Amino acid sequence: MNVSALANFRVQPMLACESHEILGFELLYRHRVDFTNRRQMLEVDIEALKAARFLCTAYKSKLRVHCNVEASSMLNLDWVVAMAEHMVPGMVIEIVERN
């Protein structure tokens, strides 16, 4: 896995309020998503898993990396398989409702 996994994401740091120490990152898709297109949202959600894995691996799981998943994607076998393949310590999956 290489840095190209991050190509479609902005990496937003999460900071401690007093020390401003980086506690983790949130991955945000950098393009518009058609929220009526479940297939497109599924592809974005799978891509987010791969990007989160890349960051967790790069930081040796010492920082939390948050990625979003649409609730409907979690019911899709493709997402479940991707999650099983890419989940590593440090990843946080946030369930979102985009529409």
Report each predicted region and the residues it spans.
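Bacterial c-di-GMP phosphodiesterase EAL domain
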Residues: M1-V88
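The catalytic core of metal-dependent phosphodiesterases that act on cyclic dinucleotides
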Residues: A84-N99
